[in-house]
Amino acid sequence: MEVPKAVLDRHRPDGPDPKPELQDCYALVSMALYGLGHSPAAFHKHLDDFFQNDGWEPLEADSCVYIKYGADGKVSAIAATFVDDAVVTGTDEALAEYRKFMQSGFTISDAGTPEDFLGMQISYDRKNKKIKLWQEKYIKKMAERYNITLSAKPPRTPMDYNKKLEPTQDGDELFDPTLYRSYVGAIQYAVCGCRIDCCFTVRELAKHMVKPNVNHAAAARHCIQYLLATAHIGITYEHGDYQRHYEKPKAGFIVRNGVIEMYTDASFAEDVITRKSVSGYASVKNKAVITYGVKGQTKVALSSGDAELRALSECKREADWLHKLRREANEDRTVRSNLTKLPALTIWEDNKSTITWVSNPCQHNKVKHIDVPLKNIRNAFGKLGELDIEYIGTTAQLADCLTKALAPTTHWKLIQLLMNIPCSDLPTSVKMAAAT
């Protein structure tokens, strides 16, 4: 559902009072404009008041998500807004009431069941209870804009795992870095959608936005070629119980339907210049990833356990937000009121030293310098009971592909599990390797 001319129809907020000597330096607009920085915020404020006056409740975890409760105290509808676009789900009665409610205050364009949203395509398999998100249209349009086509042997990974992108030396930078920055921005938009497989790559490319060189531009075009070759893949969510098996029995675990499982990993001293490590995390529900992130650590870790603990701290922050979100979005109003305790979130960690430091308060000699994040994790792990940290083997650590460039076989093994890609959708060049 869309609100055409949403910003233009809104009341213009009061501007500053210019000094008399600066009267000629200001222009007074008669309405809010899309080009003004405060225009989306002004419309959101109007929309927020409109929703709350009808009984919709915004989430504290995300102010753009609203919940409507029925007379029985159960959730009847959920609306997620993005400026002038909205996706709504709920009962048939609640959706009919929502349409009337929106039409009473706005001129709306109702597209029915969403098939495109923010550059993502959405398909539904109601018989098998599956939903797929992918970005084929956006990726093909991006490749056409940059005149990039598939070669006879398309890349199997978004980044060459045998090469590191090093900083540009004086005199080697591109004459005009504008095109390179456009490459990175276009790839990043795909990553913000559903292409988690390029998450680490776009982080590496973005480090060289100021002074890119020819090698950086070639790496960016390589990534776009990879996206074009795999434009048909996406994230598929399923409903139902299932179990995952790995080659090492001790590394295997059962993923429960409807339960959020989190994975965190770190690549120790990944940056060849600063020797700072890279943190990555991913949260999975209903067979596929729902949130993910990659971030360079701000301080140099002294060991792999040190780097993993800092990555665990970043993952814990995401877990805090997810814990709050699932409480607020729960179908039962009593759960949102903190009257019912939710089960702990499970975080899978592949470093035993890190798990020991968290679970054993006597282990402190090697972690005195990171005492604050450690105590934060221990508090959630022990006293609050919000986290459950479990060991998982390195070969089964799904977040490994977020912290480093991997060989094709390993890359696709992890990406297939994270995105829940059926074997039939895998690129021809990796089907055999991924199936073994």
For the regions a protein language model found, what residue spans apply to each?
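Active-site-adjacent structural elements in folded domains
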Residues: A61-C64, E166-F175, A186, E247, ...
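A common structural junction motif
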Residues: M102-A111
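RNase H-like nuclease fold core
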Residues: I254-V255, V259-A307
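Conserved pre-motif C helix in the palm subdomain of viral-like polymerases
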Residues: M1, V7-Y69, G73-F101, L174-F200, ...
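Structured nucleic-acid-interacting core domains from mobile-element enzymes and related host factors
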Residues: Q225-A266, N338-K341
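C-terminal reverse transcriptase regions that engage the nucleic-acid substrate
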Residues: V29, L33, G37, T113-H239, ...
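Amphipathic alpha-helical interaction motifs in eukaryotic regulatory proteins
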Residues: D48-Q52, Y66, R99, Q103, ...
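RNase H-like nuclease module associated with reverse transcription
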Residues: H208, V259, T298-T436
